[in-house]
Amino acid sequence: MPKMKSHRGACKRFKKTASGRVKREKMYGSHNLEKKNRKRTRRIHQSTLVDKTQEKQIKRMILA
């Protein structure tokens, strides 16, 4: 059986942390930032952890 291929789109979007959780960037942070207030843009630029209900599927996609 051939080797499993990782999902390249998921590999670009998610990273595995040292503790084993999956980290992701928040959405709405690439353009039109002048319309959003400073508090919102500051929160957008912080990364967050993936929800535990989706963690198993994403780990399978990135082969972690």
From Swiss-Prot:
Family: Belongs to the bacterial ribosomal protein bL35 family.
Keyword Ribosomal protein among UniProt keywords: yes
InterPro entries in alphabetical order: Ribosomal_bL35, Ribosomal_bL35-like, Ribosomal_bL35_CS, Ribosomal_bL35_sf
Protein name (record): Large ribosomal subunit protein bL35
Record-level Gene Ontology MF annotations: structural constituent of ribosome
Key words of the record: Ribonucleoprotein, Ribosomal protein
Compositionally biased intervals (Basic and acidic residues): 25-35
Organism this protein belongs to: Chlorobium phaeobacteroides (strain BS1)
A cellular-component GO term for this protein: cytosolic large ribosomal subunit
Keyword Ribonucleoprotein: yes
Gene Ontology biological-process entries: translation
Chain intervals for the UniProt region annotation (Disordered): 20-42
